[in-house]
Amino acid sequence: MRHYEIVFLVHPDQSEQVPGMIERYTGILTQAGGQIHRLEDWGRRQLAYPIIELHKAHYVLMNVEATAESVEELETAFRFNDAVLRSMVMRTKGAITEASPMAKAKDEREARRSSEERSAVEAEVSEEAAENAAE
């Protein structure tokens, strides 16, 4: 079996159906004995250029180990699904399991946002304590 990196873009109006699509596509690969090494749902993002007058799409990245036949079946499923705007399948030399730069940046943003929220809550608590002490 070979290793592949797969990216597909879904129509933004179909974003709520992405989890079902991911489940179906990973099922195609795993039923044929394939293995999913990395699966990242990047969410709705800006496109570099308009596709069918759309400026945003829902991005999904997968790194898999699968047979060529199952990857061909997956590409056919992409082709016949109108919600999939674009797809790209690239063969890679090995399994890629670490988080992509996009996922790392998203995790850092979420961590920074949660720490800012925590510090804001702590500031409110200390202000309330100071007010209570002043009374």
Curated annotation (Swiss-Prot):
<feature type="compositionally biased region" description="Basic and acidic residues">
    <location>
        <begin position="104"/>
        <end position="121"/>
    </location>
</feature>
<dbReference type="GO" id="GO:0003735">
    <property type="term" value="F:structural constituent of ribosome"/>
</dbReference>
<keyword id="KW-0687">Ribonucleoprotein</keyword>
<dbReference type="InterPro" id="IPR000529">
    <property type="entry name" value="Ribosomal_bS6"/>
</dbReference>
<feature type="compositionally biased region" description="Acidic residues">
    <location>
        <begin position="124"/>
        <end position="135"/>
    </location>
</feature>
<comment type="similarity">
    <text>Belongs to the bacterial ribosomal protein bS6 family.</text>
</comment>
<dbReference type="GO" id="GO:0006412">
    <property type="term" value="P:translation"/>
</dbReference>
<comment type="function">
    <text>Binds together with bS18 to 16S ribosomal RNA.</text>
</comment>
<dbReference type="InterPro" id="IPR020814">
    <property type="entry name" value="Ribosomal_S6_plastid/chlpt"/>
</dbReference>
<feature type="region of interest" description="Disordered">
    <location>
        <begin position="96"/>
        <end position="135"/>
    </location>
</feature>
<protein>
    <recommendedName>
        <fullName>Small ribosomal subunit protein bS6</fullName>
    </recommendedName>
</protein>
<dbReference type="InterPro" id="IPR035980">
    <property type="entry name" value="Ribosomal_bS6_sf"/>
</dbReference>
<keyword id="KW-0689">Ribosomal protein</keyword>
<dbReference type="GO" id="GO:0070181">
    <property type="term" value="F:small ribosomal subunit rRNA binding"/>
</dbReference>
<keyword id="KW-0699">rRNA-binding</keyword>
<keyword id="KW-0694">RNA-binding</keyword>
<dbReference type="GO" id="GO:0022627">
    <property type="term" value="C:cytosolic small ribosomal subunit"/>
</dbReference>
<dbReference type="Pfam" id="PF01250">
    <property type="entry name" value="Ribosomal_S6"/>
</dbReference>
<dbReference type="InterPro" id="IPR014717">
    <property type="entry name" value="Transl_elong_EF1B/ribsomal_bS6"/>
</dbReference>
